[in-house]
């Protein structure tokens, strides 16, 4: 989080890599995931969380079962109904179908949930950086956080960079740098910048 010396009033809970629908060496983890989501819902309620972050790999496969999707949507409905100030930000991971995850966005926005799976392009082919930005409000209704909501980046999602190094790594770096530059110009004195993303390095990490 990039901020000045003021205190951020938004309580954030970060999660990643749910992998709903996963079968682990033949073992169906549905019961485990149900227990986890019940625990998470209770944590959100007890700790009065204002923003839940899900940083990639919501599902284990790009074409999740109806049961896995039902578990996901029921959780979102439950926690946003139980917690009237809760906002949710979700970015796609490499296991998720970017388009499938983002497809119900208009419905999810009615439940204060923002999903970023696809890196959209403007008419001229430039990256739509506004789409990769999510505003989070405090309980007074003031925008306090500008989120860099960046999904897992595939070839063609990031700016082309002339480099003798790793073109993927440098392209990803350039996208984050350009997005940060735009948000830095946009932010006001009382707003912080929160980076949310998904990357693969020596290990898989939701940021």
Question: What residue spans do the PLM features occupy?
Answer:
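N-terminal active-site segment of His-dependent metallophosphoesterases
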Residues: 3-77, 81-85
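Active-site neighborhood of phospho(di)ester-bond hydrolases with catalytic His/Asp-centered motifs
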Residues: 15-16, 52-56, 87-94, 116-119, ...
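Metal-dependent catalytic neighborhoods of phosphoester/phosphodiester hydrolases
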Residues: 25, 58-76, 92-111, 117, ...
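Cofactor- and metal-binding active-site motifs of prokaryotic enzymes
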Residues: 62, 82-83, 91, 129-134, ...
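Short, charged helix-to-loop "capping" segments that act as catalytic/coupling loops
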Residues: 79-88, 122-127
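His/Asp/Glu-rich metal-coordinating catalytic cores
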Residues: 96-207
């Amino acid at each position: 989080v990039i901020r000045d010396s003021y205190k951020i009033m938004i309580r954030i809970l970060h999660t990643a890599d749910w992998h709903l629908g996963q079968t682990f060496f033949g073992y169906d983890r549905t019961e485990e995931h149900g227990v986890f989501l019940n625990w998470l819902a209770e944590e959100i309620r007890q700790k009065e969380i204002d923003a839940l972050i899900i940083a990639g790999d919501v599902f284990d496969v790009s074409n999740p079962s109806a049961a896995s999707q039902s578990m996901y949507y029921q959780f979102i409905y439950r926690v946003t109904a139980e917690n009237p100030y809760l906002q949710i930000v979700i970015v796609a991971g490499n296991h998720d179908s970017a388009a499938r995850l983002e497809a119900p966005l208009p419905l999810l926005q009615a439940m204060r949930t923002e999903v970023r799976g696809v890196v959209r392009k403007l008419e001229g082919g430039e990256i739509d950086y506004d789409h990769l930005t999510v505003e989070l409000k405090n309980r007074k209704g003031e925008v306090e956080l500008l989120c860099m909501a960046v999904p897992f980046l595939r070839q063609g999602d990031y700016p082309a960079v002339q480099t003798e190094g790793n073109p993927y790594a440098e392209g990803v770096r350039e996208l984050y740098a350009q997005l940060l530059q735009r948000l830095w110009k946009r932010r006001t004195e009382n707003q912080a910048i929160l980076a949310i993303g998904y990357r693969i390095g020596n290990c898989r990490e939701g940021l």
